[in-house]
């Protein structure tokens, strides 16, 4: 996991939904849990350059304990090149990677079972979707 990573998140059924990621790495490895909640969802437009307004219950958390001012740069849009999701992520919401034109790869675990619409719209460099699972492990793929 990245040592310098800030995350805007909210509680959701079963754990935490990541709404926005901040830091200096174009290839973040997202945390397995946030404040004791397992990360189970990636929210709508999470990595999109332009985002809709955030919900009132959104909270900020960082790996190193620094506040939001220490993370002025979102990992979004043309900056993001690859993302490693925690193995427990079950859902990728609509347009989570919308207009991430330099996104080359995404690594997800076998818990993934729901993928929203327009997830990879305009992700022209995307050439690898890595499903990190044992060959005989059950996956959400149908």
Identify the residue ranges that each predicted region occupies.
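Structural signature of tandem-repeat unit edges
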Residues: 2-15, 22-40, 52-91, 101-114, ...
